């Protein structure tokens, strides 16, 4: 009798095929631990610079509390990469690590989607989505690069292997071809996200960003082996669904009640909206997001919405916006340009808009309740953030010192805000004291007429999806260097002037034209008062162009004062 031949069964997959499943779960657990740690940091952490600690220690504490991308991403990826290289040989089993890169990029997406929820109910009390803007920007780039490297390294591996056909591996195998398509889409997204490209056409970047993200989430489970359908695809689709629901449930239609604009003098405009569009209470300095399209319009989902800081308080009869609309017009044709320029966005009375939602400012709760020594510094359209804060603290009897400094380029901007105060009957005389004041610094000539050559050409707001306010190139030109005495003398022969131009608020508002501006001298009384009160009672707010924010931040670090800022640029 003949013996049967020995049959050997060969495993379909090598022993390394499932090597990365546990690593994906590990990344998910680290993401959860990071979220819990972030919630605890914001709930019990200290952002206040200690007067007894070193400047370096205070800086690290502030950056940690402020969700600085370098600090937080460093901590996150340190934890994620600890077990990345483990057990398998990098030379003989390199495929394990190439696949691990792909799983890492997909496993990090739930955390990124969660942190960009608006509103984020888990972190709502101590965070606002604007706190995560810088983190989200860099986190998204890293995830994208990791995913792209996964594809590039596999192509290189197959190309240099004589025993493998690149065409057969990359094109003829459906799973790998889907991955190749994902890599092309990701590469296109990275090109569109480069600074000059993004600024040149932000709308294109925004559309590509959203479509590629959705494609990455839905196509990767087709490409991935072993699969990532559970729990990663389920989590990602759930979070995407919540994003969509938030843009539907909280949205409502609105129309402009009134618009005060004089484009021949300034691009700063005052827009009035119905009070009913917002809840009975919202924090001073909150903002709204507006889309020119209705929810049923595909462009509502494809194009970015526009953020505007609310210049009014909750007790006012209307919702007021003080914004800058952009123009590329020649003198005499400002309105026509605003209507025709595809790179500008303006609010028009005859149109219906969609209010997506309102959002709180990135201001700690203890600031509103405990602040008694307050300084507010703003530039240009940053007045929309500064003015409601000033009014809030002005109405508090326990405030010992309050000063707002507004830096602008021409007098017409001040006229518009003054008209807004008069129209709304906002006078401060009844509660006026020597320790409460507004100082307006004008770098241009003190006249009621604005030179048309001061109206600069603008590009689409690169941060319209991410940032507050109506920051544009005009505010960016509002550099601190425009307010030094040397620059003032060189502009023309206009002497330095200082006076109070209004009867209603004459003792409160002081307008200074062609004055040199030194932050330390303007805040001398504020700094003296800070030494007399508890540290959590002294706060400095800043809003405007980068040069102003940097100056304010440095001042607070040097003097160890609580600092809150709203950025009008990336």
Swiss-Prot record:
Span of domain Ferric oxidoreductase: 101-219
Record key words, sorted: Electron transport, FAD, Flavoprotein, Ion transport, Membrane, NADP, Oxidoreductase, Transmembrane, Transmembrane helix, Transport
Chief location category: membrane
Pfam family, one: FAD_binding_8
Any GO BP annotation: reductive iron assimilation
Stored InterPro entries: FAD-bd_8, Fe3_Rdtase_TM_dom, Fe_red_NAD-bd_6, FNR_nucleotide-bd, RBOH/FRE
Keyword Ion transport annotated: yes
Residue stretches making up the FAD-binding FR-type domain: 250-388
Highest taxon of the lineage: Eukaryota
Ranges annotated as biased composition (Polar residues): 481-505
TM region positions: 21-41, 70-90, 101-118, 142-162, 177-197, 204-224, 230-250
Record-level Gene Ontology MF annotations: ferric-chelate reductase activity
Top EC group: oxidoreductase
Recorded GO CC terms: plasma membrane
Region (Disordered) residue spans: 481-507
Complexes and interactors: Interacts with ribosomes.
Family: Belongs to the ferric reductase (FRE) family. AIM14 subfamily.
Function comment: Probable cell surface metalloreductase. May be involved in iron or copper homeostasis.
Name the record gives this protein: Probable metalloreductase AIM14
Annotated organism of origin: Saccharomyces cerevisiae (strain RM11-1a) (Baker's yeast)
Gene: AIM14
